[in-house]
A protein has these predicted regions:
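Boundary/entry segment of secreted carbohydrate-active catalytic domains
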Residues: 26-61
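Hydrophobic faces of well-ordered beta-strands that scaffold small-molecule active sites
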Residues: 30-36, 73-75, 107-111, 160-164, ...
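Active-site beta-loop-alpha junctions enriched in small/polar residues
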Residues: 37-39, 78-80, 112-116, 164-169, ...
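Acidic-and-aromatic substrate-binding clefts and catalytic sites of carbohydrate-active enzymes
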Residues: 42-43, 50-57, 79-91, 169-172, ...
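Aromatic-rich peripheral "rim/lid" segments of glycoside hydrolase catalytic domains that contact
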Residues: 44-50, 179-188, 272, 276-279, ...
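Short, acidic/polar
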Residues: 47-66, 141-151, 233-245, 314-319
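Glycoside hydrolase catalytic-domain groove-lining segments
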Residues: 59-62, 200, 215-226, 231-302, ...
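Substrate-binding cleft and catalytic face of glycoside hydrolase catalytic domains
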Residues: 63-198, 202-224, 229
Length: 375
């Protein structure tokens, strides 16, 4: 394990300290996947539930994706979903998880530790947990995590990977587990400070969740992923995961979101982040969320591909090529129901990403980093 010292409020890695290397890291296969938590939702973005088809025959989204090489699938779970949120309760997650496992897919469980969306702007404590002391909250995170995994295991839907929290760049279970990103005023309240006490809370929450997941799994524990956003931001990634290393948090996968529409950087930024993570932490790297939809700011320099079905395919080919060449273990597209399908329910161009990767010479000029070239 590496050694860290605190200097002027920051973490410094001691050069020459022994480093833990993840056994077999280089040989792990790459996987293309998707977050399909919306699959059985009655409506997506105001549209009625879609009927899928291919080659003139009605089919299931999961089956079509797997037929085209998409083999990993992510499902989110809320504690007690509020009416405004999708009903991603554990009870509703189990049937879809069983379908993934029965089809031979890899299953990533995304535990939000909230009754609704948890992301860099929202990390609300579940209503039933709000009056707990911090010690009791820590214990509840562990027991809840254990119960979720044990229930899935008993239902024949054991996850292969588990995210302990979703996009927790600013922590989780606010305000008790909230931390504040240095130099990112848009992320932090004006009075925010990156205090030792807040980091202590976040570390204890993460360790409790990890203990619970492993206890619920028994002798076949899933791999643990820690997920933050901004996959092209090495400075924030280093700041966050250095804290976890200093506290000896035991996890397996660095998972990050990468959305050009949300100014997460270019593919060159992502490449730098991934290669620096490999050098510094020796963990597997997963792009746990991505997507390519219209940008929220017209001057966004990261929007290098047309926002069209063909442009989305170009983006996915470039992204997958970059992540594979950088040694990543996978890419997961968020909510493919939104924009990877044609209006008639047939698969759009990006569904065929892996087919196009077989002959990159036939693709238009790409936006991959200079280090990425060739098939």
């Amino acid at each position: 394990m590496r050694s860290f010292v605190v200097v002027a409020g920051g973490l410094v890695l001691l050069l020459g300290a022994p480093r833990r290397v993840l056994s077999g890291q280089a040989s792990r296969p790459f996987t293309l996947g998707a977050d399909i938590s919306y699959l059985d939702a009655p409506a997506v973005r105001g549209r009625a539930h879609r009927t899928y088809q291919e080659n003139g025959k009605a089919d299931d989204e999961l089956s079509i994706l797997m037929r085209h090489g998409w083999t990993s699938f992510r499902l989110r779970v809320f504690v007690s979903p509020v009416r405004e949120a999708p009903d991603n309760s554990l009870a509703n997650t189990i049937p879809l998880a069983r379908r993934i496992k029965a089809a031979g897919g890899t299953f990533l469980l995304d535990i939000h530790y909230s009754d609704t969306w948890a992301d860099p702007q929202h990390q609300e404590i579940p209503v039933a947990w709000r009056d707990l002391s911090f010690d009791s909250l820590e214990a509840r995170v562990e027991s809840y995590s254990r119960e979720v995994i044990r229930t899935l295991k008993d239902s024949g839907a054991m996850p292969d990977w588990v995210q302990v929290g979703n996009e927790i760049t600013r922590g989780t279970l606010w305000p008790l587990g909230q931390v504040h990103v240095p130099g990112a005023a848009q992320y932090n309240p004006p009075s925010g400070s990156d205090s030792t006490a807040q980091w202590d809370h976040l570390i204890r929450i993460l360790k409790a969740g990890i203990r619970g997941v492993r206890a619920g799994a028994g002798n076949t524990p899933p791999r643990i992923a820690i997920h933050i956003d901004r996959g092209g931001d090495w400075a924030t990634t280093e700041w966050f995961f250095d804290h976890l290393e200093a506290a000896h948090v035991d996890y397996d996968i660095i998972a990050q979101s990468f959305y050009p529409p949300w100014r997460h950087g270019t593919l060159e930024d992502l490449w730098k982040n991934m290669t620096e993570c490999a050098r510094r932490y020796h963990k597997d790297f997963l792009v746990a969320e991505t997507g390519y939809e219209p940008t929220h700011s017209p001057d966004n320099p990261d929007m290098l591909w047309p926002v069209t079905p063909e442009g989305r395919l170009q983006f996915m080919v470039d992204l997958v090529n970059t992540v594979k060449k950088a040694g990543g273990i996978g890419v997961m597209y968020w909510a493919p129901e939104w924009d990877l399908w044609n209006a008639d329910g047939t698969p759009g161009p990006a569904v065929f990403t892996l087919d196009h990767l077989k002959d990159l010479s036939a693709r238009p000029a790409s936006h991959v980093p200079p280090e990425v070239s060739g098939p």
